[in-house]
């Protein structure tokens, strides 16, 4: 009998191979404690009352309590189906739905209703569209800036195949932070992210840096990389002009996904954070439960503090007016 996914899709060959490895037992340090303060409760009630949707809740992020207490949240745009298939990601891949051109307005409205100080916007790849979703990403930033003056926006995008005209469209919206995640090291990159290219991802970050944007990326550990390869990838990111970096532990979403090769101990995350700072990153978040959008507003403010002399379009880059 042919194995299928919960939604009825036939397993890909790589998924079938992954499924032969049982789900790994998590170590004791992969724990989070729920601290539900007044801001979290207020935001939770607002989301329930208004019928809003965030990645924070729908993906079961372990950091939701901390981020919501700081009025930070993450939104997913472009639908719930990705046109590429990364072996670590729980988002479904396949033929995406038709583009919803009203989505940017609705996301901005949600940000306003939630009273966010900082919003992260990410999305699926849309290789089915002529512009690969560049307009959608850019317009969402513009709508949030218009609806909620002073709210910082972090935009986490795919690579748009490195097409300069599409990158320029996204850069023109001037997000406070432009993020593009390399996720892993060159040796295993193709097997982990077959629809992407390591050097192309670095080129995207370099282009954003050259456009005067604060840039950010993420590395996931536990996929089969070595410590030396991690250090080299961090150096590659800095050479590309990356300002901020998050370093995270891979947690396997299901038996179909890439197995966890190793559990990285908290002490190693601390060592890697120190190494990243020595390389010159303006902001670093490194830990087993860190995610790429974890405390995104705090990292942005760290970058601004270290780049007060940087000029963008003839004006000093300014942080949004948040506490």
Swiss-Prot record:
Catalytic activity: [[Fe-S] cluster scaffold protein carrying a second [4Fe-4S](2+) cluster] + N(6)-octanoyl-L-lysyl-[protein] + 2 oxidized [2Fe-2S]-[ferredoxin] + 2 S-adenosyl-L-methionine + 4 H(+) = [[Fe-S] cluster scaffold protein] + N(6)-[(R)-dihydrolipoyl]-L-lysyl-[protein] + 4 Fe(3+) + 2 hydrogen sulfide + 2 5'-deoxyadenosine + 2 L-methionine + 2 reduced [2Fe-2S]-[ferredoxin]
Binding site for [4Fe-4S] cluster 1: 56, 61, 67, 293
A Pfam family annotated for this UniProt entry: Radical_SAM
Needed cofactors: [4Fe-4S] cluster
Domain Radical SAM core: start-end pairs: 68-282
Documented EC number(s): 2.8.1.8
Principal localisation: cytoplasm
Keyword ATP-binding carried by entry: no
Protein name: Lipoyl synthase
Naturally occurring in which organism (per UniProt): Acidothermus cellulolyticus (strain ATCC 43068 / DSM 8971 / 11B)
